[in-house]
């Protein structure tokens, strides 16, 4: 009985400390959302500055996100695209939006999701087009492997979407029924529509193609990195032993 009583008194202060919210603990920092940063955006201005759109947590779906509009004069809030509209056929959860773009005519929405990092930034992922009149979701580049599309963007007339897929440039119609591959030499040391490590790292160049204003042409970067020698970086953090990361890196007086 005496031992049990002593244990009860010993455990009481511990339970009290665990409930003390003034005490900063590893559990509170890393195993809860208590200190998660509050993010704003991505935000998109609407025409003539009448309002802007941004992302906010859904009130109806725990893991969902709504796209909302704020009027710049009145501050009035309106949900334009609810999380319920972002659930693809056959799935239970809505798309996790990393970024989005409105078509110029505001009839379609391009959604960037399921992203992966390329060197420093999450520039590779999946894209979906949401028809804002029928609320139908179409996946861009349906035949592509998951998280392999980059820098998708609407044509100015809103009729097509262009993107980089595995170092080549593709164009498809909004409904996704017709896909045209514009380049076919992208492989290994040939890169179309984006850049190699050096140009991203040193110059911040990543998004390497643009539509013409009339939606009839696309201008793009074409990189031929053949002949550039390899520089090896050492990764000491991701595994027990160091790993070598080969990068093509030109130096003064060498091929670039």
Language-model segments: what does each one mean?
Residues 18-256:
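Beta-propeller folds
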Residues 2-12:
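Sec-dependent N-terminal signal peptides
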């Amino acid at each position: 009985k005496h031992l049990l009583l002593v244990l009860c008194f010993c455990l009481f202060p511990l339970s009290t400390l665990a409930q003390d919210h003034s005490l900063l603990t590893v559990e509170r920092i890393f195993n809860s959302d208590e200190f998660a940063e509050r993010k704003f955006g991505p935000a998109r201005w609407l025409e003539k500055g009448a309002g802007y759109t941004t992302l906010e947590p859904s009130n109806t779906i725990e893991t969902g996100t709504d796209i909302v509009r704020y009027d710049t004069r009145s501050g009035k809030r309106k949900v334009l695209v609810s999380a319920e509209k972002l659930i693809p056929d056959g799935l239970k959860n809505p798309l996790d939006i990393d970024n989005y773009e409105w078509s110029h005519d505001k009839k379609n929405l391009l959604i960037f999701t399921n992203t992966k990092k390329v060197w420093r930034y999450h520039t590779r992922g999946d894209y979906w087009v949401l028809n804002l009149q029928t609320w139908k979701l179409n996946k861009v580049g349906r035949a592509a492997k998951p998280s392999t599309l980059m820098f998708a963007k609407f044509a100015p007339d809103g009729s097509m979407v262009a993107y980089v897929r595995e170092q080549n440039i593709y164009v498809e119609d909004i409904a996704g029924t017709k896909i045209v591959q514009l380049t076919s030499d992208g492989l290994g040391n040939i890169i179309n529509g984006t850049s190699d490590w050096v140009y991203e790292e040193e110059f911040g160049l990543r998004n390497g193609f643009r539509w013409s204003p009339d939606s009839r042409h696309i201008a793009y970067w074409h990189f031929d990195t053949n002949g550039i020698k390899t520089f090896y970086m050492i990764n000491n953090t991701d595994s027990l032993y160091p790993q070598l990361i080969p990068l093509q890196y030109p130096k003064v007086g060498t091929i670039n």
